[in-house]
Swiss-Prot record:
Residues 712-726, 915-927 have a biased composition (Basic and acidic residues). This is Activating signal cointegrator 1 complex subunit 2 homolog. Residues 16-64 form a coiled coil. It comes from Dictyostelium discoideum (Social amoeba). Transmembrane segments: none annotated. Residues 563-606 form the CUE domain. The keyword Ribonucleoprotein does not apply. The keyword Metal-binding does not apply. GO terms for biological process: rescue of stalled ribosome; ribosome-associated ubiquitin-dependent protein catabolic process.
Length: 941
């Protein structure tokens, strides 16, 4: 009825229109929501597709194996489209806000906590931390296109305060002491937060420099050619920068700095040319400094400080020590300028350093001492640091160009330096003596050339002052005379007059006796060398000396060397892993100075290249294989050839001595390496059981129990609840856990029954008259639990070891008497033969021990037997019947009351354990058959 009345209701036009509008609005809203959803879905799909394309591009880059200089990255621009951007582009620095960084410069005031220095260091740390987190291509984009980064690094390397460089003031001594006290560490002034932030800045700058020196990382790499041009053209690394890096970080990260400098010079050889130009610039500044000082009538100490003389010397010394290959440019620059003429100001860095060392610094030092009363304090503060650094510069040059060359010729080692060329011995000695002559003559040339330009004051100074000889001071520190003697002994072409002149110059004059001794060395050196060569090459050692002297050539060979064992032992006391020959070479290089050798071994970077490349475990000269330790096989062959008894005895003694000496050497080497012998304990075969740990067999584990526990277990066996306790405790008194732990080794001892029977049979003839029955009682209880179907006296071992017992009864027959052999064979026979042979044993016992026979057999009746299963009861009853049949002729000898039986049970249960404690450790420590000498008699007693 209601449905029929609805059409009759008429809506007004207005209501109808509103209704339609609402319906239309709902449709529009639904369509809008659907469109928005569809739009979002489409946008997400597009983004996902673009991200997939970006990931695919990254995978292709990794698979292509191209450097970042040849690859690009897909980027979504502002319009939502993909756009290609090179991996090295300004986009990553300027246009991208995510990777934008702007650095501020480091000022000298930032070394101290003043004003805004703390805030500026915080900004620097935050920018450096974000830079180090960037990917490889973004990091390199900042290095190339971000100028603020390069300006920051340059300012930091220039103005950051050095920690190890001694800043010397030639004007005031108080400032010297203050500066030296402040140079012990990087930061000492300021609060803790400021010092920590400054140390963090110091580390992060170094990490940035190290990353700039790396050509390859996990996230990418740069091709070698592009990288070499990149760092050189963009001036990411320059020679002044490298000098500053070495002076700042060489004392903190020496190995990292050496690898960084070496890799930079290897990738870009143009830096060698720049290094030569840099040395020429240093020599020019020293020339100008000398001219400005000599033209004045006053000692301008401030001018000497403002020209950074100490800074130049310190940086040069540190750089050459870190990078010895740079000494080639320094030495070549010196030789080039000497050819042009040293007096015109082009003498090279080495010439000007000798001039300042011998004349300028002593003049200023002397006048400064006159001006102040503290003469003692001024001398070390001004003169000594410069002296040490200048001498170190000359030592690195001598070592790299001459000393190492000579060692390489002697040891036949290939030259590791790429720039060095192999030179003969004559050329090495000629260059070295010419260098010494030029060093001594250059200062005189400068003094003669500048005589007209000097002021009257300096003319007086040069006339009155006594110059310091740089070679004499070098002799006091590095022992130049040892190297000169070595050259003279090896090379006969050296002029002896020049040798005596330089020896007198360094304070080592050659006497007339030494001259007479020295002259034959020139001729004998070559003959000795050639004789050694001929003797080593020929199979027989009986070559005539005339043949050896025919080939006279200045060739080096492995001469017989006498090693200083005392100094070698001193070095090996701190470094026991080193070989004698390696330590000998180190002592030879450092002029037999043990302290220098130890310091060099502590810092491996200070070792010369030929010692680094040498095997440190060498104990003898590798070039002389004939001098090895004789093996015993060579001496044993001599014994077979000889017929006389005397000869044979001597030959045999030599073999024993060589073998004993070789064994003693092996023992001493093993004792030095304690860790090797100690680690052998923890191999796979190591057993941590009680038997291995204690040294006793597991069968003797009962003696580790206390006597109180043994008495408790014996009392429990005699109580009325014995039948209920046997399932939980074994017949030997152990718990199930102990029986499980100790049951495994018992199966591994199949000869246990025979050993115990041997002891029982010996005790019948040697020991007391009541020991054997007590041991038989202890053997019976553990036999019922594992195998209840066997008789208690037939087989003391489990059923698994019947076969090895049948195969091994013949071993003790040769060492023991015939009576114990019969007793051994009884428990090892098969069960069918055992009932016939078993009554023989109690008959023997009754004959020898008729009075004490009833004691051991009484406890067998009250002792309970395990009843783990009802099926075993019939077998146990059969065993009891067999035992009673065996004991029938002995039953009339047992008329004793029950109280005596209980006392005897307790005594008998205690006595076998005491005898067991005394008897059983001995067979475990001795080999088989050792009981034949009566080893168990003492234990039975």
């Amino acid at each position: 009825m209601q449905q029929q009345q609805q059409p009759k209701v008429k809506l007004s036009k207005k209501d109808y229109i509103e209704k339609k509008e609402k319906e239309q609005q709902l449709l529009n809203n639904n369509n809008k929501v659907n469109r928005e959803k569809d739009g979002k879905i489409m946008i997400e799909k597009n983004l996902q597709e673009k991200q997939d394309d970006i990931l695919m591009n990254e995978k292709k880059k990794q698979q292509s194996g191209l450097g970042i200089d040849k690859t690009f990255t897909l980027v979504i621009n502002t319009l939502g489209h993909l756009e290609k951007k090179n991996d090295l582009d300004q986009y990553w620095v300027l246009n991208n806000k995510e990777y934008h960084l702007s650095f501020i410069t480091f000022l000298p005031a930032d070394n101290n906590e003043q004003g805004s220095s703390e805030e500026s260091i915080l900004f620097m740390n935050s920018d450096l931390s974000s830079l180090l987190k960037f990917q490889y291509n973004i990091f390199w984009s900042h290095c190339i296109f971000n100028k603020s980064l390069n300006e920051f690094i340059d300012s930091f390397l220039k103005f950051f305060k050095r920690d190890n460089q001694p800043i010397i003031s030639l004007v005031n001594n108080n400032s010297v002491n203050n500066n030296n006290n402040n140079n012990n560490s990087i930061i000492k002034k300021g609060s803790k937060d400021f010092n920590e932030s400054k140390k963090l800045l110091f580390k992060r700058v170094f990490l940035v420099l190290v990353r700039m020196s790396l050509q390859q990382e996990k996230s990418g790499f740069i091709t070698r050619e592009f990288y070499s041009d990149l760092i050189y053209k963009n001036k990411l690394f320059t020679i002044p920068k490298l000098f500053d890096i070495v002076s700042l970080y060489s004392s903190h990260a020496r190995d990292a700095v050496t690898t960084m400098i070496q890799s930079i010079f290897d990738t870009q050889p143009n830096y060698y040319k720049d290094l030569l130009q840099h040395f020429q610039l240093i020599s020019k500044t020293l020339f100008e400094l000398n001219q400005s000082l000599l033209n004045r009538n006053l000692l301008d100490l401030l001018r000497l400080e403002d020209n950074y003389l100490m800074d130049i010397v310190y940086n040069l010394e540190q750089f050459i020590r870190i990078f010895p290959m740079g000494s080639h440019q320094l030495f070549d620059e010196y030789l080039m300028n000497l050819e042009k003429g040293g007096g015109d100001g082009n003498g090279g860095v080495l010439g000007w350093l000798t001039y300042f060392y011998e004349y300028i610094i002593p003049i200023f030092n002397k006048e400064n001492q006159k001006a102040s009363n503290k003469q003692v304090n001024l001398t070390p503060s001004i003169y000594v640091p410069l002296k040490q650094h200048i001498l170190s510069i000359f030592h690195t040059i001598f070592r790299h160009h001459f000393m190492i060359k000579l060692e390489q010729l002697q040891l036949l080692i290939q030259d590791p330096c790429q720039l060095c060329k192999k030179l003969p011995l004559d050329e090495i000695s000629h260059r070295f003596f010419s260098l010494l002559g030029n060093i001594t003559s250059f200062s005189q040339q400068i003094i003669g050339s500048t005589k007209s330009n000097r002021s009257k004051l300096f003319n007086e100074y040069f006339d009155n002052i006594t110059s310091a000889s740089i070679l004499y001071d070098y002799e006091q520190t590095y022992k130049l005379s040892n190297f000169l003697d070595k050259l003279v002994t090896l090379d006969s072409s050296i002029d002896f007059t020049s040798y005596t002149y330089f020896m007198q110059l360094i304070g080592k004059p050659v006497s007339q006796d030494q001259k007479q001794i020295q002259k034959p060395k020139f001729k004998k050196s070559t003959t000795i060398i050639d004789s050694n060569i001929s003797s080593s090459s020929s199979s027989s050692s009986s070559s005539s000396p005339s043949n050896a002297t025919t080939t006279v050539k200045p060739i080096l060979s492995n001469n017989p060397v006498i090693m200083n064992t005392v100094k070698i032992d001193q070095v090996k006391s701190l470094f026991p892993d080193l070989g004698d020959w390696f330590v000998h070479c180190c002592l030879k290089y450092y002029n037999q100075d043990v302290e220098q050798v130890i310091n060099a071994l502590c810092d491996d970077s200070s070792l010369p290249p030929h010692l680094k490349s040498m095997d440190r475990s060498l104990s003898s000269d590798p070039s002389q294989p004939s001098k090895n330790i004789p093996t015993p096989t060579t001496t044993t062959t001599t014994t077979t050839t000889t017929d006389k008894p005397n000869n044979t005895t001597t030959a045999t003694t030599t073999t024993t001595t060589t073998t004993s000496s070789s064994k003693s050497l092996e023992k001493s080497m093993n004792e030095l390496n304690i860790s090797i012998g100690y680690e052998k304990i923890y191999d796979e075969k190591y057993d941590d059981s009680l038997e291995e740990f204690s040294g006793f067999s597991v069968q003797d584990g009962e003696k580790y129990n206390d006597e109180d526990e043994d008495e408790k277990k014996d009392s429990e066996n005699n109580t009325n609840t014995e039948d209920q306790k046997h399932p939980t405790t074994s017949a030997s008194g152990r718990t199930p856990n102990e029986s499980n732990n100790l049951g495994r080794p018992r199966q591994n001892n199949p000869n246990k029954g025979r050993k115990e029977d041997n002891r029982n049979n010996k005790q019948q003839t040697h020991s007391s008259h009541h020991s054997q029955p007590q041991q038989q009682q202890q053997q019976q209880p553990p036999q019922h639990q594992p195998q209840p179907h066997q008789q208690p006296q037939q087989q003391p071992q489990p059923h698994q070891h019947q076969q090895p017992q049948q195969q091994q009864p013949q071993q003790p027959q040769h060492k023991q008497q015939p009576k114990p052999q019969q007793s051994k064979q009884h428990p090892q026979q098969q069960p069918k033969q055992q009932p016939k042979q078993q009554p023989q044993q109690p008959k023997q016992q009754s004959q020898q021990q008729p009075k004490q026979h009833p004691q051991p057999q009484q406890p067998q009746q009250p002792q309970p037997q395990p009843q783990p299963q009802p099926q075993q009861q019939q077998q146990q009853q059969q065993q009891q019947q067999q035992q009673q049949q065996q004991r029938q002729p002995q039953q009339p000898q047992q008329p004793q009351p029950q109280q005596q039986n209980q006392q005897q049970n307790q005594q008998q249960n205690q006595q076998p354990k005491k005898s067991q404690n005394d008897d059983k450790p001995k067979p475990d420590k001795k080999p088989k058959g050792s009981y034949s000498k009566g080893g168990s008699v003492g234990g039975g007693r």
